[in-house]
C-alpha cells in the first residue's frame, strides 16, 4: 500500500487558546442553508457598488460636470 492512514490521537496537533476562541466560527462549516438565502441581497449590494464605481469613474474622467469643483491637486492644497 502506497499510503498509510493513521487514526491515532497523537496526530491531532497542538491545542491553542486562539484555536479554542476561533472554533465557534468554524462550527457551521459544510452546512448549506436551503434556498437562495441572502443571494438576492448580495446581488443588490453588488449592483449598488457597481453604480458607485461608475460614478467615481465618471467624476475622475470629468464626464460629469461639477460646478465649482476643481479637479487638480493644487485646489486641494488651498
UniProtKB/Swiss-Prot annotation:
Phosphorylation is a light-dependent reaction catalyzed by a membrane-bound kinase; phosphorylation occurs on Thr residue(s) in the N-terminus of the protein. It is found in: Plastid, Chloroplast thylakoid membrane. One of the components of the core complex of photosystem II (PSII), required for its stability and/or assembly. PSII is a light-driven water:plastoquinone oxidoreductase that uses light energy to abstract electrons from H(2)O, generating O(2) and a proton gradient subsequently used for ATP formation. It consists of a core antenna complex that captures photons, and an electron transfer chain that converts photonic excitation into a charge separation. It is a single-pass membrane protein. HAMAP family: PSII_PsbH. The keyword Phosphoprotein applies. The gene is psbH. The modification Phosphothreonine is found at residue 3. One of its GO terms (biological process) is photosynthesis. The chain crosses the membrane at residues 39-59. This is Photosystem II reaction center protein H. One of its GO terms (cellular component) is photosystem II. It comes from Tupiella akineta (Green alga). The lineage of its organism: Eukaryota, Viridiplantae, Chlorophyta, Ulvophyceae, OUU clade.
